[in-house]
């Protein structure tokens, strides 16, 4: 291959297309890096090892070409490695005058000696002078690049449709979803409107700086799949709010509580009837769970008070049922709780039976502890039964711990006993213990601002509770580390005494 003038025929940074890092991968695959001398390749490897993109990776100078080929399989994941290697090789090309390491079939040659009948230059194919020839590797990477840009636009359109149609879906799904499956949820929004929006995004210029300055994970763009039609998208969104079966696999018969939520959201013409039905569904668990032979009179009074509290809670929820943000939050929490519950049930199949028993005990304890408060508020709650507007009494009921079908602190210590984190008792200084720490009953109410609807069922774990428990574990571990540092600063003789006392404490426990 004859040498070509590097200043004329070589590929420059300004020649790179829209998504620069994708073109970097194309050019890296076409360079004959394996033909370089061992000294230059070792220098490239040395520069790569000094960068954070290649930290912890063993790089062989003789395997640079194969490594670049592996990057083409997952170009999005290796985006920053591709950019870093491009810059390193550019520096070495300028330093060592490596203007001829391109393969012979990369640059398109112009045959100016051959002319046609019209006096113009000979046919050059579909490529202008000094452009990259469409080799096999180029076609593969170019296809990935086009799909990347297309997915970016589809992701933006999908997110925009979700935001614009949430209110329409939530207002119309109760009346339209029970009709034919192909019925459009919103007649004002057609497939033609969707196509017009897509054309508007295609006309906009794609900013290449968004790829380089984007600090988020690029893989999240490929995890979002756009539905085929707008109707399919709307049915998908509405089904999560109107379907009467959430496929919650548990052993505690929470279908009554879940159907209570559905009955409230699926009634637009007979709210009073549905309110009575939902109250009956909620209070069935109360009547079934509070069969205590020793406290029949107290339980009857408490059940009446709980009925009034539940009426206030349901009235408050019905008035705020059109809150789109709350619906979206509930959907996310429901998915999170279902996934966690399914995984936890596989690890601890017998845990839910213990949890159910502990829940019943906590319910009875709360009833006995709040007898006086419920008796004093009985008259106020009865006055609020026919009032559908939220008031101060409703807010107090939401904050009260006397909800027999959802106890926030139920079985917390038993669940913590399964945790893999080994904590230390705070009563003995730096004494290890095999028992789980006692979780304070008022810890959550003091350290978390929780806005959670109790009608969602007793088996739904709120994500806020896991956050608070993790903070509790973190405090325990910090106390342990501080105690160990204090022991390390003491003299050796005193450390031995502390170790002996710690061992005695362990034996006593």
Curated annotation (Swiss-Prot):
Compositionally biased tracts (Low complexity): 116-127, 153-184, 243-325, 365-397, 423-442
Residue ranges the record marks as coiled coil: none
Sequence ranges of Acidic residues compositional bias: 189-217
Stretches for region Disordered: 112-131, 152-325, 365-457, 488-509
Biased composition (Polar residues): 228-242, 398-422, 443-457, 496-509
Name under which the protein is recorded: Putative uncharacterized protein DDB_G0267716
């Amino acid at each position: 291959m004859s040498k070509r003038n590097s200043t004329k025929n070589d590929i420059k940074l300004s020649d790179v297309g829209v998504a620069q890092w994708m073109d970097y991968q194309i050019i890296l695959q076409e360079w004959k890096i394996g033909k370089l001398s061992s000294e230059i390749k070792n220098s490239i490897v040395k520069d790569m090892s000094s960068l954070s993109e290649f930290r912890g990776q063993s790089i062989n100078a003789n395997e640079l070409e194969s490594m670049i080929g592996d990057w083409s399989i997952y170009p999005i994941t290796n985006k920053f490695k591709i950019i870093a290697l491009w810059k390193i090789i550019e520096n070495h090309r300028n330093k060592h005058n490596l203007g001829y390491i391109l393969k012979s079939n990369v640059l398109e040659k112009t045959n100016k000696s051959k002319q046609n009948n019209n006096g113009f230059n000979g046919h050059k194919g579909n490529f202008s002078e000094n452009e990259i020839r469409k080799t096999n590797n180029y076609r593969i990477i170019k296809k990935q690049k086009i799909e990347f840009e297309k997915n970016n636009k589809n992701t933006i359109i999908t997110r925009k449709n979700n935001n614009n149609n949430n209110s329409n879906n939530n207002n119309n799904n109760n009346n339209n979803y029970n009709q034919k499956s192909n019925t459009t949820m919103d007649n004002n929004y057609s497939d033609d409107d969707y196509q017009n929006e897509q054309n508007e995004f295609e006309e906009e210029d794609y900013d290449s700086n968004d790829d380089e300055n984007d600090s988020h994970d690029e893989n999240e763009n490929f995890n979002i799949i756009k539905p085929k039609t707008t109707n399919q998208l709307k049915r998908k969104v509405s089904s999560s709010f109107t379907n009467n079966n959430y496929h919650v696999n548990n052993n505690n018969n929470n279908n009554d509580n879940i159907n209570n939520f559905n009955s409230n959201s699926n009634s637009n013409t007979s709210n009073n009837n549905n309110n009575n039905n939902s109250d009956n569904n909620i209070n069935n668990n109360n009547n079934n769970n509070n069969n205590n032979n020793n406290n029949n009179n107290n339980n009857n009074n408490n059940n009446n008070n709980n009925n009034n509290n539940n009426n206030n809670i349901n009235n408050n929820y019905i008035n705020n049922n059109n809150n789109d943000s709350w619906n979206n939050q509930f959907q996310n929490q429901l998915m999170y709780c279902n996934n966690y519950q399914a995984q936890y049930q596989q690890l601890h199949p017998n845990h839910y039976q213990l949890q159910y028993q502990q829940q019943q005990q906590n319910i009875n304890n709360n009833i006995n502890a709040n007898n006086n408060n419920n008796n004093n508020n009985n008259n106020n709650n009865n006055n609020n039964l026919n009032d559908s507007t939220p008031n101060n009494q409703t807010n107090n009921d939401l904050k009260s711990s006397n909800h027999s079908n959802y106890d926030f602190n139920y079985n917390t210590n038993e669940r913590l006993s399964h945790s893999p984190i080994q904590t230390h008792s705070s009563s003995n200084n730096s004494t290890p213990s095999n028992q789980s720490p006692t979780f304070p009953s008022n810890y959550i109410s003091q350290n978390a601002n929780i806005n959670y609807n109790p009608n969602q069922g007793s088996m739904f774990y709120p994500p806020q509770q896991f956050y608070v428990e993790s903070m509790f574990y973190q405090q325990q571990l910090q106390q342990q580390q501080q105690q160990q540092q204090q022991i390390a600063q003491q003299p050796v003789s005193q450390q031995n005494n502390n170790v002996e006392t710690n061992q005695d404490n362990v034996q006593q426990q």
